[in-house]
Curated annotation (Swiss-Prot):
The active site is at residue 168. It catalyses: a ribonucleoside 5'-triphosphate + H2O = a ribonucleoside 5'-diphosphate + phosphate + H(+). This is Nucleoside-triphosphatase. The lineage of its organism: Eukaryota, Viridiplantae, Streptophyta, Embryophyta, Tracheophyta. It comes from Pisum sativum (Garden pea). It is found in: Nucleus.
Length: 455
């Protein structure tokens, strides 16, 4: 018996090497195909968000169903730097170089063998949109050159661009509804979004086919009010509009423009300075008596052009169609400064990723803030003081209230979810447009079905 075992062992080691699939037949071959298929259609995406106040990197990992996979303990790698690309208007090469630390971080996250197949995109938002002349294009070209020469990622010809406000709003709508698990459901089950950035504010929500069909036509060259997007096989009609010059930082300039030679009723007693935005300077002087809530509110209403002629049945401000309202707007998610300002003024705990907010809550906080003088505001709101914007706390709070109630027509008591992050499975994702952009980038890869595309 011992001799027989030795003979069998000898024969086994003497046989030519064979693969496990050959040896075990179709069973292992089938399971190996499944493994390879999962590996092949799992993919990373890298998105740069070049905003008006800073640049951010987002890295995502998707499976074949377009679900997020873990990167470490979370489902998103994220980091940011300041200042934004628009700060390098006169030095485009330095603008591109400023992104290299973020690029290197992304390269550390994505496995080396997957980097050539990983799409990378950069979307520049309102900050670059507001630059004069060809300054923005020079910066973008420098970034293209840097990525092509320096990066091992998949850089497509259209990978680096200025994304317009409607794209920004559309991508954010996808991000929020993706994270909440609403994609593939009826439009009435989706959530509308409002994003108050630095240079612009966007609103996006799904509407009925009837509303979309009857949407007003726009002038040549203007963005249409309705964007059609297919997500997981379900077509959605999105009302999207971006209001350039009405982001948090840009709106201050619009408000101060109205008082070039006189004090501004939105500024706190004891403040006298110059506000600089997008290369322009604006006088910022307070009345000796300080801010006046009602006068400030009226000044902001003028800045929003609420009395501008409305050629449609219903408008927001500046003669812009409001999208008709409806169930797609019934539930709203507000992001960016709609979260950061309440956070910085103590309306919410800093560790909270999102919370319920009503416009009337902002109004109440505004009345408190406007009663302070500049020195008291600095001590009351240390986070704003650290950012050197405590002088504008009254203005910013009233602006948000007027924007929501008078601009977008919301009830002062309407409950809105305001957040910087959204729970996704056992992790969180940032409530921002890059995830929606990444979903589109992944869907464009040949190995994925077209799970998301704009019509």
């Amino acid at each position: 018996m011992e001799l027989l075992i030795k003979l069998i062992t000898f024969l086994l080691f003497s046989m030519p090497a064979i693969t496990s699939s050959q040896y075990l037949g179709n069973n292992l071959l089938t399971s190996r195909k499944i493994f390879l298929k999962q590996e092949e259609i799992s993919s990373y995406a890298v998105v740069f968000d070049a905003g008006s106040t800073g640049s951010r990197i987002h890295v995502y990992h998707f499976n074949q169903n377009l679900d997020l996979l873990h990167i470490g303990k979370g489902v998103e790698y994220y980091n940011k730097i300041t200042p934004g690309l628009s700060s390098y208007a006169n030095n485009p090469e330095q603008a591109a170089k400023s992104l290299i630390p973020l690029l290197e971080q992304a390269e550390d996250v994505v496995p080396d063998d997957l980097q050539p197949k990983t799409p990378v995109r950069l979307g520049a938002t309102a900050g670059l949109r507001l630059l004069n002349g060809d300054a923005s294009e020079k910066i973008l070209q420098s970034v293209r050159d840097m990525l092509s020469n320096r990066s091992t990622f998949n850089v497509q010809p259209d990978a680096v661009s200025i994304i317009d406000g409607t794209q920004e709003g559309s991508y954010l709508w996808v991000t929020v509804n993706y994270a909440l698990g609403n994609l593939g459901k009826k439009y009435t089950k989706t959530v509308g979004v409002i994003d108050l950035g630095g240079g612009s504010v966007q609103m996006a929500y799904a509407v009925s086919k009837k509303t979309a069909k009857n949407a007003p036509k726009v002038a040549d060259g203007d963005d249409p009010y309705i964007k059609k997007v297919v997500l997981k096989g379900i077509p959605y009609d999105l009302y999207v509009h971006s209001y350039l010059h009405f982001g948090r930082e840009a709106s201050r300039a619009e408000i101060l423009k109205l008082t070039p030679r006189s004090p501004n009723p939105c500024l706190l007693a004891g403040f006298n300075g110059i506000y600089t935005y997008s290369g322009e300077e604006f006088k910022a002087t307070a009345y000796t008596s300080g801010a006046n809530f009602n006068k400030c509110k009226n000044t902001i209403r003028k800045a929003l052009k609420l009395n501008y002629p409305c050629p449609y049945q219903n408008c927001t401000f500046g003669g812009i169609w409001n999208g008709g309202g409806g169930n797609g707007q019934k539930n709203l998610f507000a992001s960016s400064s709609f979260f950061y300002l309440p956070e910085d003024t103590g309306m919410v705990d800093a560790s909270t990723p999102n919370f319920i907010l009503r416009p009337v809550d902002i109004e109440t906080k505004a009345k408190e803030a406007c009663a302070l003088n500049f020195e008291d505001a600095k001590s009351t709101y240390p986070f704003l003081d650290k950012k050197n914007v405590a002088s504008y706390v009254c203005m910013d709070l009233i602006y948000q209230y007027v924007l929501l109630v008078d601009g977008f027509g919301l009830d002062p008591l309407q409950k809105i979810t305001s957040g910087k992050e959204i729970e996704y499975q056992d992790a969180i994702v940032e409530a921002a447009w890059p995830l929606g952009n990444a979903v589109e980038a992944i869907s464009a890869l040949p190995k994925f079905e077209r799970l998301m595309y704009f019509v």
